[in-house]
Amino acid sequence: MLKLESSSKLALVVDDSMLIRHTVCRFLEERGFQVEAATNGLEALEMLATLEPDIIITDIQMPRMSGVELISALKNDPRTAEIPIVALSSLKCGARGPAEDARADFSILKDIDIEAQLESTLALALG
């Protein structure tokens, strides 16, 4: 199991599903992350005015501002462009899904053992 110094890494989790948000936040907290959560892309952008997360995990399909729009905004902002972004999606469209089209650094399918995927993705993203 990936274990980081308890105060060393901050993650921002963005998902409109309370169940997914809770699952991902709990998973990260158990591995020593400090975690902040938002329910949509607009709320996440507001939080990022004062937060400097080490990683952002975001759903793709959300109301108000989708994950695709959030990722685009983050990658176009020099202040947040280098933060690793993990996109969560229940969709897989052909060879490229919405996460890849949005320029996410990593993507995870919600329908397949999300915790195992998070474990391996965090190891890649944060070493």
Regions found by a protein language model. Name each.
Residues M1-L10, D113-G127:
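Non-catalytic signal-transmission and effector/linker regions of two-component phosphorelay proteins
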Residues T39-E43, S66-S72:
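Acidic catalytic/metal-coordinating carboxylates
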Residues D59:
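Active-site residues of response regulator receiver
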Residues V86-L88:
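Hydrophobic/aromatic residues positioned on beta-strands within the core alpha/beta folds
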